Amino acid sequence: MADRTAPRCQLRLEWVYGYRGHQCRNNLYYTAGKEVVYFVAGVGVVYNTREHSQKFFLGHNDDIISLALHPDKTLIATGQVGKEPYICIWNSYNVHTVSILKDVHTHGVACLAFDSDGQHLASVGLDAKNTVCIWDWRKGKLLASATGHSDRIFDISWDPYQPNRMVSCGVKHIKFWTLCGNALTAKRGIFGKTGDLQTILCLACAKEDITYSGALNGDIYVWKGLTLVRTIQGAHSAGIFSLYACEEGFATGGRDGCIRLWDTDFKPITKIDLRETEQGYKGLSIRSVCWKADRLLAGTQDSEIFEVIVRERDKPMLILQGHCEGELWALALHPKKPLAVTGSDDRSVRLWSLADHALIARCNMEEAVRSVSFSPDGSQLALGMKDGSFIVLRVRDMTEVVHIKDRKEVIHEMKFSPDGSYLAVGSNDGPVDVYAVAQRYKKIGECNKSLSFITHIDWSLDSKYLQTNDGAGERLFYKMPSGKPLTSKEEIKGIPWASWTCVRGPEVSGIWPKYTEVIDINSVDANYNSSVLVSGDDFGLVKLFKFPCLKKGAKFRKYVGHSAHVTNVRWSHDFQWVLSTGGADHSVFQWRFIPEAVSNGVLETTPQEGGADSYSEESDSDFSDVPELDSDIEQETQINYDRQVYKEDLPQLKQQSKEKNHAVPFLKREKAPEDSLKLQFIHGYRGYDCRNNLFYTQAGEVVYHIAAVAVVYNRQQHAQRLYLGHDDDILSLTIHPVKDYVATGQVGRDAAVHVWDTQTLKCLSLLKGHHQRGVCALDFSADGKCLVSVGLDDFHSVVFWDWKKGEKIATTRGHKDKIFVVKCNPQHADKLVTVGIKHIKFWQQAGGGFTSKRGSFGSAGKLETMMCVSYGRMEDLVFSGAATGDIFIWKDVLLLKTVKAHDGPVFAMYALDKGFVTGGKDGIVELWDDMFERCLKTYAIKRTALSTSSKGLLLEDNPSIRAITLGHGHILVGTKNGEILEIDKSGPMTLLVQGHMEGEVWGLAAHPLLPICATVSDDKTLRIWELSSQHRMLAVRKLKKGGRCCAFSPDGKALAVGLNDGSFLVVNADTVEDMLSFHHRKEMISDIKFSKDTGKYLAVASHDNFVDIYNVLTSKRVGICKGASSYITHIDWDSRGKLLQVNSGAKEQLFFEAPRGRKHTIRPSEAEKIEWDTWTCVLGPTCEGIWPAHSDVTDVNAANLTKDGSLLATGDDFGFVKLFSYPVKGQHARFKKYVGHSAHVTNVRWLHNDSVLLTVGGADTALMIWTREFVGTQESKLVDSEESDTDAEEDGGYDSDVAREKAIDYTTKIYAVSIREMEGTKPHQQLKEVSMEERPPVSRAAPQPEKLQKNNITKKKKLVEELALDHVFGYRGFDCRNNLHYLNDGADIIFHTAAAGIVQNLSTGSQSFYLEHTDDILCLTVNQHPKYRNVVATSQIGTTPSIHIWDAMTKHTLSMLRCFHTKGVNYINFSATGKLLVSVGVDPEHTITVWRWQEGTKVASRGGHLERIFVVEFRPDSDTQFVSVGVKHMKFWTLAGSALLYKKGVIGSMEAAKMQTMLSVAFGANNLTFTGAINGDVYVWKEHFLIRLVAKAHTGPVFTMYTTLRDGLIVTGGKERPTKEGGAVKLWDQEMKRCRAFQLETGQLVECVRSVCRGKGKILVGTKDGEIIEVGEKSAASNILIDGHMEGEIWGLATHPSKDMFISASNDGTARIWDLADKKLLNKVNLGHAARCAAYSPDGEMVAIGMKNGEFVILLVNTLKVWGKKRDRKSAIQDIRISPDNRFLAVGSSEQTVDFYDLTQGTSLNRIGYCKDIPSFVIQMDFSADSKYIQVSTGAYKRQVHEVPLGKQVTEAMVVEKITWASWTSVLGDEVIGIWPRNADKADVNCACVTHAGLNIVTGDDFGLLKLFDFPCTEKFAKHKRYFGHSAHVTNIRFSSDDKYVVSTGGDDCSVFVWRCL
């Protein structure tokens, strides 16, 4: 058989010719070592100009396109393109990878930048969103990411003087970014009038917020802050591509070929025009500049690098040049000298010196060059062109000899014949033309058999033959020079070839993988001397093969560097070098060849990673010298760990079936049983596909795993403690080096690893999110801080975790085949080794990734499948055990030697202090010294060695050993057969536990009299187990076939076993020897049962659809039951032994009579009365309820009823064991369910006395023993069973407030939608009518009257410059809770309303504000830890809401957390240490998230509940425990690493208690939790069990609770009618046993408290109605601090004409008068209906209020008594006005009318006129100063003027122009056209008001903005200032009488804002 191994020689990259100047910029720098760093293709190059040497970084796998230099000038970051691109940070000294950043960007990484201290790296992606990311690059951790821009970003730069500030620029934009927490927020640069909006190409930041940027037009734009302040015009005459900042100043380079230097203030120093220099040329374009001291670097578009010394700037040196843009295909080497020539689509031919690494000549052609060839004497050079012509040049002076064009298509291949007389030219037309050199290249022959383009040609040594390859994959031969085809095989065989560059033919068939496309290898070249072949392919690889290379799929060595296609490879004339060309990367690589003799079989590992790569994984064919896989290993690799359905699919399946069957009326479901189960003991150990999964704890207990359970086994007591946290098969287990912690990994779609404590069995951390299918190997690092895991995905990913935090540190792809073991290096925490199928790799962590080296075997051994590995005591020594039985000894990555240890694979190895212990398939344990030089002792595992204290029997001698460990003077061994043995060092062995081997277990039978059971499995064994405290296997027998069922006879002496081949046998139950056997059926026997009493009959059911009945005494078949339409699943006898009940796979329930087997049809009602001997069936009305809602997917495999008929146990395909109360009638009965089995529970049986349940688990091979806990014994210890889900019927009642809050939908609010239903064209889109006479500029006419009456003429006209928020009246209580707190020991309070966080000083009443939120704040919490005093967190509504953490005193934002709680965050809370924050969203899943807020990192997140969660709070003494309550929701959470685990509250059997809607939480000592319920009870929990009720703590829902940290007292607040005894606020003792009630004295019928907080002797209370009240604990006196409007939009607003007062009128049915100076409520009146508008009379004595129901009221201001009222309309009054002369009242309504009333006629209020012809509802009205006219704005965006009081419309523009208005509140009209914004299509400007001075107008809109404009405001989109604070809609706005204040009202935020005018 031909040799398929890789060659022993190697290549090493020596030089790269080229620099990537196209489509990149800023990619050329000086390092600290004065070397030049740049990139080309996929290689980072460090070029030392002094020594003319290069170093290479080869860590990328595709084109590098971006590069950044770390501030230390040594570290380099490079980014690449690709589907999953990554960033490498590497050291320019030793070109080692320091960190890898991956898994975030797609498409490519376009820009990179380090910040000034080098800690953070910013990167920009090439994806559609141009994502910007910030990395903590050393950790490989993403800190923040954000959408960059809609178009390309070209450059990014950090501000060196301000941390966390960054600038990016690109197509038509520049953005200024700030990083806060995990939020990256951008503000766009404002170009203004200073410069044109245009594309910015490069940036540099300077001090004092100055940013310099280079623009596409050649200008430098200078920015201060966000604003463009000046431009330096014509800095370059075309686009500026590069801008470099350094100590000396700035350097710029542009498309005009100039470099300009500027000083630190950007004053010009000098200019260097490279086009004008010696090497310059027209069109030279600079892409990158770098300035260091006296030197400059410039990189050009055409791949040159210039170095300029500043003193001699007219003499730039060209230090590097390569081919320009255009594909590079042509390559030829000089036949006699170390020269190479290349030709490219850039139309140049270049001659390179291989010895000097330099370009010696360049010749430009007219056409693209695609092939070149030297004549044999080296004097002539032929070039094949893209246009089908070829040119021959004289090499000496590069002059043309001939130019011939015979073809149209490109010439891709040409070669001179070895004797120099002919030139063969192959074109894409198909033929090869032959030309005679001596006859001036006359064409003398043509080879034309090819049907496709010619790819390769080779001449024979004697120049008589030619072979060709073409695009169709054909290989043809021709006689030369005629071109006659040659077909004789014999003749062809003997031809010696002068060169071999063809990719087809027997000699090179090994270069092709076994199954492949034909075209992906572009070029090969053979080195006959060393018998090696080099190839270049489409994947950027250069490979070395042996030559000839005959068998497909040969091994090779591969070399990376080229990014995409390697277009050509050639040997130099003396075989010293290989040259390769890259198509797209236009680079030429020069590789030094290291022959075998030099490398002498040992691969030197070059410093470059990714270099010297032996035995590539690409082609793992079983080649000559690798033995075939051992059968055990092969079997293991075939196991499939995928599941049809995973446990996490259950909720969805349930949901789907609910939706399908929603028509079914909801009947009362059966109650769950009272009794429960406890898992006591498991027989089994998973050895058949796992290893190293057996350990001693320090306490001497044994840990291992079986099914989904991890077992802690006590040897002394022969008892087990079980960790039940997993929900599927555990596949791997490892123990912590220091503590008794264990990590276990399981099967799963998103496979989890649990780290748990063996003492407490509590989960410490749960690691998820990075493995698919399963976790097959685990290991802790030596210090125990890290954990490494290997997954079962296709790449066998390796993940390195910080397990305590639950964060992944790094990941990488492991190997394409299974990895068996991973081990951490004991000395170096960042090094690992993995072994697996034909695999050993040594890994080094680098940031978020790993770099790896394969084990290098050299001549000491061959590549083997490795089964185990250990580090030695000495540094760098590694020992691995192979499938051959050898131990391989490694130093670093080199194999030193091998030692024969076992026959067959070495499956297990364990390192000791002074040696090793190994175990193999041969069943022998061997003790070795520390270098595997001597075997000190061997132990063979044999039956004879078993001690008497063994708990079972060995199935066979020398079982295969899968796990081994030492400790406590013993060797612990786990076998493939499922046995765990303990070997004493002196020799005796004790069997501790055992179970079935690989194969499904279905057969299970309990002995009728004794605590014994039998099991039978597909592993072809029958086993008998003792179930008393001994728990051991009594007997075992091997069977010829596997079995699926067994049964004891009624006296227990005989045991019947049904086998899978259709036979069955009856054995003696004691000796397990045959009594009789039959083989009557072909398909498997599925059930077997003896009839009752004497056991006269035996019924045998099979998959042949029959049940056979045998007479036991006569041993004859007496009857056959026919009639089932499918296979039989279960059978049961009745108690008389006459009737058989049968279940079939078609869900039939049938009855047959013994002995003949006659079929009976029995009505269900009758069947229920029959007494059955056993019940194992799953069908029929009495067990209808055991089928789950989604049972079309899952099946119930088994059921069994207790003897007393009360309890039915079932086992199903989800691994659940369930208990039901029998009979189980009606659908979907409730149950208790238990986990432990992994996927399927195949059988369940009660022991003869019903005290124990036995279950077997199918493929998990486990036999589990559960004890039944009766109701009586349960009270003492509550048991967790996963209860079935609770239902709606159980909620604790209904409350209107809770119902409202449940139904609140925040999404409608997020989007700014118009609050009024307007129609028509917006004002700024209407066409303007030109007024009749546009007045001439100078006119004799009288001056135009003022637009607006000036009220305060006496004062100087005052322009309002700014607004500042001064006070807010409002508190959001209606849908929030616990959002009101004391600060500074009760001196201040903090709360929120609208989008403002408010701090109010109680002594002065003054307020300060936090206004960074963009929409309604929904929650607020204060950090209680003294270290974080006054730290507040708030969050809001929004599609991607942010949580802001800020300092309450300075209002400085400390951190911002961008959340993915879509819709909004409705509760937040700090942990005990103040470092963590938990948030819960109003998204559909109600996600709960835990944050480390200072770092801005998300720790963990998980869906909380399907309905609203109201509160989530940390325990006051914990950072890991918290509680959430909500709609029928009560969960106790633990933060385990980065996972959230919860336990539901267990209510148990407490009488009055129901799981109901919970609204609030408080905490007590000793793990007590109090929760307030909707019905007014408080539930008291200990851990997660309910222990008592505080009945009716309040009469209504308990909305809020507060735990005082200093004394533990608890305050509750609820909804309650004030009575003598009760109150809505109560103060309780620590146990909530005694309380004191407080009245709030608000005068309301029902007080509803939403927030309480306790300070020093005071209780702070917030109510649903927006009041904030302080209650004295001693005096019980209450003091109202804030009395805002209640829920409802506020539309009515009017300011007093002369005093600092205003009135607001709201939909809450009240009107309130406020004092502007003292900021307090003066008076309020209840109107009984929603109010919509208000107006003062000009004398300020009366106020008119319009109502939503069409009524209006006039009140006297002083007393708020009604003066008069009237209702002439039935729909809302929108605006109301009293005329300046106090005569008329105008009332505008939704009925498109304005009514006029005469006030002088007294309180009768008769209507004296009205306006009709109004096109839509009225919005605003203004009277003229003389009370003769009124202007009306309408919902159709039309403004009309009417006469008063007749209502006639005024249409003459002339008249309208001359009116002076008393006030202006209209948003319509030419005077205010400028207030309408561009983006108003969905939202409107709602209100406006002009100052009394007439110089400003302020507006409020649907975006929640206040805007201040100049008045009049006649230009569209006028300039303005904007103010935030309101949330969505500003409904009304007014200036106070003296223009000192602006008052604005909010729609949804029910708040009144007062702004000071500055």
UniProtKB/Swiss-Prot annotation:
Its main location: cytoplasm. PROSITE patterns: WD_REPEATS_1 (PS00678), WD_REPEATS_2 (PS50082), WD_REPEATS_REGION (PS50294). Residues 1322-1337 have a biased composition (Basic and acidic residues). Residues 604-627, 1322-1352 are annotated as: Disordered. Pfam families: Beta-prop_EML, Beta-prop_EML_2, HELP. It is found in: Cytoplasm, Cytoskeleton. GO terms for cellular component: cytoplasm; microtubule. WD repeats lie at residues 59-100, 104-145, 148-187, 195-233, 235-273, 280-321, 323-362, 364-403, 406-445, 561-601, 725-766, 770-811, 814-853, 861-900, 901-940, 996-1035, 1038-1077, 1080-1120, 1191-1230, 1236-1276, 1412-1456, 1460-1501, 1504-1543, 1553-1591, 1593-1638, 1685-1724, 1726-1767, 1768-1807, 1880-1919, 1925-1958. Residues 615-627 have a biased composition (Acidic residues). The keyword Cytoplasm applies. Keywords: Cytoplasm, Cytoskeleton, Microtubule, Repeat, WD repeat. Belongs to the WD repeat EMAP family. May modify the assembly dynamics of microtubules, such that microtubules are slightly longer, but more dynamic. This is Echinoderm microtubule-associated protein-like 6.
